[in-house]
Amino acid sequence: MQGLVILDKNDEVIRPAILWNDGRTVKETNYLNEVIGKERLSECTANIAFAGFTAPKILWLKENEPDNFAKIDKIMLPKDYLAYRLSGCFCTDYSDASGTLLLNVKNRCWSKEMMKICDVREEQLPALFESYEVVGGIKTELAEEFGFTINVKIVAGADDNAAAAVGTGTVGEGGCNISLGTSGTIFISSKDFRVDENNALHSFDHADGGYHLMGCMLSAASCNKWWMEEILKTEEFDKEQENITKLGENQIFYLPYLMGERSPHNDPDARAMFIGMSMDTGREEMTQAVLEGIAFGLRDSLEVVRSLNIPIRRTKICGGGAKSQLWKKIIANVMNLKVDVIESEEGPGYGGAMLAAVGCGEYENVQAAAEKMIKVVDTIDPDMELVAKYEEKYQKFRQIYPAVKGLF
């Protein structure tokens, strides 16, 4: 998940992992985008640099911790470190490798040019597998320690968002999944490789063997958690939402950029704000504005998808925020999409289990697993009157970030 784990020649961890949401690499990200150039990056990897990607972290390490950089024998992503300890296999999967900015996404191989730019050797990078492929078996001593048989297989696994997409059945051509987790994503599965003109969306390999486009918000449910727990000092999320009934009429706006933003702005300096309060504004209006602001932020990425003439009419939804019936209704009307709720609430974990089932031969492929294991239990239809109200509000929302960008 784009975090950086580095081991020395003795397989000892050199330093604490630098996580996906670490913002220290602004300088390195700017160097990649401005000096190396976005066009060149896109040609090599199908993406431009974002502060959370792994390559900027490697450059930061080289500049700021040269002694640690010199010790690197293996470069890993967090989940792959666990697989390495369990099986001894130094590997990763294509979906997770896509976020390193070291992978040629279209051709599913490490980019020699990006390795040169980051001063990385191919032997320092893990072997590449499809997410559903078996990479090895559990070590005998660990099988004994955990009480497992030695026949336990280790499957490559996937990036959290790709796993969530599999776990909601978002595979094949034209599937859509919205994840309302700590971060928020809108994920479009595809059989064909695609890149948007401005690289506003991530263009990654998918865990089903195909490709996907993804818009990523750094703060989604975490915005709601911050508002509820830090500002309102409550953990009763449902109670705070139960009196919100006048959808589409609230004129308070919230920019959901607590930790900067990725898609589509790629601005680590962006910050959150409320706009439009008056003496009549209360906590219900502010709470509603937070939920709507996150939905509008995801809509920004959906607009990029629509600009590519990809027809999206419905979406799956997962993540902790998807437990809120109100939020799902807001999403349906802001996006003008049918929102399908699946039986399992554990998108990424369920998707990981599905990939393991394919790897162990229970299903022929990921599509077949999805057809058998995914069940839609509810659908929220958009209300065209609310769609019209939210369309008007969204057009105002999208003017705010450009207007205040210079203040950050």
Feature annotation, model-predicted:
Residues 1-20, 48-52, 83-104, 127-130, ...:
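Short beta-strand-loop/turn "lid" adjacent to the catalytic site in phosphate-handling enzymes
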Residues 15-29, 342-343:
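Short, acidic/small-residue loops that bind anionic groups at enzyme active sites
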Residues 26, 33-91, 101-112, 116-119, ...:
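Active-site core segments that coordinate phosphate-bearing ligands/cofactors
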Residues 118-130:
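A conserved helix-loop-beta module that forms one wall/lid of the active-site cleft
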